[in-house]
């Protein structure tokens, strides 16, 4: 289970180092690798342990291909999905097309989101977080379904 926020860097070759805590969390999955794809809603990447991704892909494969919204989602998620390995130093080489989509430069923010990680440009994440914390966004959170959550 992934949680927490982590600041990391990308080297000149496009490799991102996973913090030790996240490597430990990933090791619990006993998978040979990870899958990284784009987020169809935000300018970030989604990193899944291989076994978690396979469950998602099974659901995506069952969507009706003649439904435009389903096809769009399949193209975005599966079309950009890339199998990657974590090297012995705990680094992942992020492909250039994925880095370009998420506007990743040298400084990244990794957010634990349960069964997946979100990989953001630090600048993009800070702007998004400020937007989430704005008064209008906070008022949007006050829906009936959110009232059942106690923090």
Swiss-Prot record:
Pfam families, alphabetized: MraZ (PF02381)
Primary localization class, coarse: cytoplasm
GO molecular function terms listed in the Swiss-Prot or TrEMBL record: DNA-binding transcription factor activity; transcription cis-regulatory region binding
GO annotation, cellular component aspect: cytoplasm; nucleoid
Record bears the keyword Repeat: yes
GO biological process: negative regulation of DNA-templated transcription initiation
CDD domains: MraZ_C, MraZ_N
Keyword Transcription regulation tagged: yes
InterPro entries xrefs: MraZ (IPR003444), MraZ_C (IPR035644), MraZ_dom (IPR020603), MraZ_N (IPR035642), MraZ_sf (IPR038619), SpoVT-AbrB_dom (IPR007159), SpoVT-AbrB_sf (IPR037914)
Compartments reported by the entry: Cytoplasm, Nucleoid
SpoVT-AbrB domain sequence ranges: 5-52, 81-124
Record NCBIfam families: division/cell wall cluster transcriptional repressor MraZ
Family statement drawn from the similarity comment of this UniProt entry: Belongs to the MraZ family.
Protein name, as recorded: Transcriptional regulator MraZ
């Amino acid at each position: 289970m992934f949680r927490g926020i982590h600041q990391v860097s990308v080297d000149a070759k496009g490799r991102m180092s996973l913090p030790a805590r996240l490597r430990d969390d990933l090791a619990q999955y006993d998978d040979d690798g990870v899958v990284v794809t784009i987020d169809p809603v935000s300018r970030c990447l989604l990193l899944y342990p291989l076994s978690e991704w396979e469950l998602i892909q099974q659901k995506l494969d069952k969507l009706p291909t003649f439904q435009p919204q389903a096809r769009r989602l399949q193209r975005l998620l599966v079309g950009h999905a890339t199998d990657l390995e974590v090297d012995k130093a705990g680094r992942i080489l992020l492909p250039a097309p994925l880095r370009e989509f998420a506007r990743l430069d040298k400084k990244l923010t990794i957010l634990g989101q349960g069964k997946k990680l979100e990989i953001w440009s630090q600048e993009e994440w800070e702007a998004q977080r400020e937007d989430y914390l704005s008064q209008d966004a906070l008022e949007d959170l006050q829906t009936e379904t959110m009232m059942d959550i106690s923090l």
